[in-house]
Amino acid sequence: MASRFFALLLLAIPIQAQSPVWGQCGGIGWSGPTTCVGGATCVSYNPYYSQCIPSTQASSSIASTTLVTSFTTTTATRTSASTPPASSTGAGGATCSALPGSITLRSNAKLNDLFTMFNGDKVTTKDKFSCRQAEMSELIQRYELGTLPGRPSTLTASFSGNTLTINCGEAGKSISFTVTITYPSSGTAPYPAIIGYGGGSLPAPAGVAMINFNNDNIAAQVNTGSRGQGKFYDLYGSSHSAGAMTAWAWGVSRVIDALELVPGARIDTTKIGVTGCSRNGKGAMVAGAFEKRIVLTLPQESGAGGSACWRISDYLKSQGANIQTASEIIGEDPWFSTTFNSYVNQVPVLPFDHHSLAALIAPRGLFVIDNNIDWLGPQSCFGCMTAAHMAWQALGVSDHMGYSQIGAHAHCAFPSNQQSQLTAFVQKFLLGQSTNTAIFQSDFSANQSQWIDWTTPTLS
């Protein structure tokens, strides 16, 4: 009798579901399983996402211990902002009409047309598109990322051992920071180089130098309370409008300035790439967008604030997806200008999205490396970059931009089956070889009609 009772008791105990390998197992807002199947360990990457990875890989996984402070935002109703008008210059020095200092924003649920100027003029030539890029850059700085300063009044550099020292001065203030260079065992100097945020997470390509850029030293990303901290803010003031990602892009530009000043560093400054993963992947995309001397941008698993579009992510969130959105991300770290806070709950009024940010890189090289982790918004990333790809198509160089989304691996763990794709882009843009970079793949499909109501012109 007793044995029968215990057998019935065991049957009555619910079996707790477990997440599969590579599945989510925790995070703020997660209501699914919090344990993993046998042979897998739940690893926390940030307070919002934990993933089941093979136990043999758990000890080497990148896990974040950053705590997120509480943050309250209110919905803003204003749809205009004022800033002094600035003249803009397109690629090749083309003179472009400046945006007015005050503009009226209009709600648009679809992704903004890459080929229509803010004043309604259609883009029909490559020169006109360069003006559109300058306009989008200004809009993104004005409403999301903050103003990017130019080269400071004074800049000097020195090189010793493998360390490049950059000294900057502005308005009586000065800062100094360093990067370290690891040279390849093959190839000939001056070497092409990849600037890696936090050192980067990609394997070092043959014949290419790797430059370790400590972006956290330029602008902190500890939590929202770290806004205004770092070398950039020591120079320009803690209340500068630039968010951390803009500050990092400024730092990357100063590294390239310094390399141009110091030929003894043995770096070919016409063959510079930039990379980073996760939060640093967001930063790498921003640097590639703003710094035209970068010929190859390699953002890895950048998610929200990187290769994902705000509009698409908001929609997917409304459909039940566990995905990071604009209204959530501003409470994680000071990556954006505080101006952005007023728009995160009214994303459709923004006169751009992140397909616009990526399109600033065209026609230069861009290879977007993504994962299929829910929190990164893989559907949003693929849809967003599909829209961005139209910029390269319009310019007649569609193979200068590639996209690869492969899952079943830990966050920022570069899988071997993307190696040949990465090599092709590096060889084409950094080593001057002829390779096939017509790469655009994902397990998802992009519903272009839902987000795109404009066509791709052939620019003359």
From Swiss-Prot:
BP GO terms, sorted: carbohydrate metabolic process; lignin catabolic process
Disulfide bridges in this chain: C96-C131, C277-C412, C309-C384
Temperature optimum or stability note: Optimum temperature is 40-60 degrees Celsius.
Reactions listed under catalytic activity: a 4-O-methyl-alpha-D-glucuronosyl ester derivative + H2O = 4-O-methyl-alpha-D-glucuronate derivative + an alcohol + H(+)
First and last residue of the signal peptide: 1-17
Modified residues (Pyrrolidone carboxylic acid): Q18
Domain CBM1 as annotated: residue spans: 18-53
Enzyme Commission number(s) from the entry: 3.1.1.117
Pfam family, any one: GCE_fung
GO molecular function: carboxylic ester hydrolase activity; cellulose binding
Broad EC category: hydrolase
Keyword set includes Hydrolase: yes
Active site: S278 (nucleophile), H411 (proton donor/acceptor)
Binding-site residues for substrate, renumbered to this chain: K282, Q324, E332, W375
Short sequence motif named GXSYXG catalytic site motif, residue ranges: 276-281
Entry keyword set: Disulfide bond, Glycoprotein, Hydrolase, Lignin degradation, Pyrrolidone carboxylic acid, Secreted, Serine esterase, Signal
InterPro entries from the UniProt entry: AB_hydrolase_fold, CBD_sf, Cellulose-bd_dom_fun, GCE-like_dom
Summary of pH dependence: Optimum pH is 5.5.
Glycosylation sites: N447
Family, similarity comment: Belongs to the carbohydrate esterase 15 (CE15) family.
Protein known as: 4-O-methyl-glucuronoyl methylesterase
UniProt organism field: Hypocrea jecorina (strain QM6a) (Trichoderma reesei)
